[in-house]
Amino acid sequence: MVAILTPIYEAEFLGFSYGFRPGRSQHDALDALGYGIKGRYIWWILDADIRSFFDTISHSWLIRFVEHRIGDTRIVRLIQKWLKAGVLEEGQRLDTLEGTPQGAVISPLLANIYLHYVYDLWVHAWRKQRATGDLVVVRYADDTIVGFQHRSDAVSFLSDLKERLARFSLTLHPEKTRLLEFGRFAARRRAKRGEGKPETFDFPGFTHICGTKRNGQGFQVRRKTQRKRRMAKLTAVAKELRSRRHQTIHEQGQWLGAVLKGYYAYFAVPTNIGSLRAMRHHIKVRWRMALQRRSQRQRMGWRRMEGLADRYLPQPSILHPWPEQRFLVKHSR
């Protein structure tokens, strides 16, 4: 079913939608955002969080959206059947009029269809009809960032967005949705008002920070690993090390090396080298603690531990280009 529907909707989905689409990744979304903030007049960021999106998708609206594009009633009935299968709550299957089936392969596509009609097309029209300055938007699944040149546009957009979502059984999370000053002049303007450093925002997996280039000249969006993501990975590593306590040092080292390589593959972006080095250090510390708990007779001194780290834990290096470089290559005309 996904193989049938995907080509149909790929021809319909808009360019600023990146989540769960073939040939598009989280880094493509990050590149588009970085390029938009640096290359356009963007002084304000709306970090919009839809409350419990996957659990509150209206089945009736979703079916209407599918019927708008799909004329085959057999496909529509099959989707209705999946939706009526219900969701799991504390081990019990409940019939519901909202939400997408948990774990179903088709769920991400259905979510994209829903947001295409509820959000994407509306944002596209709003930008053309209402925006008085530059506006950039990037959406990855239900995580969306909108950048504005004018604060008045941002305030109007947020008010209109709340009304728009309410029509389709969706709401913004009041505590997680934020409008913040950002961009190349944010630090200077806040300093004049006697305020602190510009606020930061997260998208997806990275904290975005107003910064400068290494030579101190010129604005640069700096990205570092989101603290929540880093701590979750370290917690998972510590837990897995306990289950691997009977493995040899060589086996543990090979596994930890693979973990770090996978971590670097996503997070090794420009401006994030410090966070990567810290991650390697914290994994080394947790490995040492695990080895010491395993062998009470022989202490694992730092000199020996450094030798093991040099052998098994790869040093970080930047693997991804600057966002504007990769974005321009992929979207060159």
What label would you give each PLM region?
Residues 2-333:
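Non-catalytic terminal/accessory segments
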